[in-house]
Amino acid sequence: ANTEIVHGGATRHESEYNALQYLRGDIEAGLIDLVLIHDGARPLATAELFVAIAAGAQTHGGAIPTIALDPREMDTAREETIARVQTPQSFRATQLLQAYEKAAVSGFVGTDTAACMEAFFPDVNTVAVPGDIFNIKITYPQDLAIAELLIPVQ
């Protein structure tokens, strides 16, 4: 497979926009049905998670991996279900490109891919796919040490 590099932006949102602009021609030509967006901060995402996310987006329009919060972490005053959201996240390519273009025009900057889709395509059914507790985000130096311990588990 060929590897192509797209320069990122100052924010996650801008990096995703740049990638979608790079893919624009193929998306508009109907050569790309789905886009999966993943960040390098979660290096332990499994192939099975990517497959599940792609299948969920193909069937429903969008898919995000989630991990249920421990009840001790939840704000019991809120009625809606709250979960930790991970990457990769996947959506149908045409709508995702349109969402990011609308975001660029309006100045919207989403915290993740799903936030941008929800802002501009609230009717897209984004399904929650079971995430992976080992798909940790590397934010601090100690996270890297934990990830190194988890590699043999996978």
Identify what each model region corresponds to.
Residues L44-V129:
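Conserved core of the sugar-phosphate nucleotidyltransferase
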Residues A1-I32:
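Short phosphate-binding loop-to-helix
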Residues E16-Y17, A47-F50, P141:
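Conserved strand-to-helix beginnings and helix N-cap segments that scaffold or border functional pockets
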Residues R12, G40-L44:
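Acidic metal-phosphate-binding loop of nucleotide-sugar-dependent transferases
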Residues N125-P130, N135-T139:
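Conserved active-site beta-strand element of glycosyltransferases/polysaccharide synthases
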Residues V35-L36:
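Short aromatic/hydrophobic "clamp" motif used to bind/position activated sugar donors
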Residues N135-Q154:
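Hydrophobic helical membrane-anchoring modules
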Residues A19, D39, A68, R92, ...:
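Residue-level signal for inorganic ion chemistry
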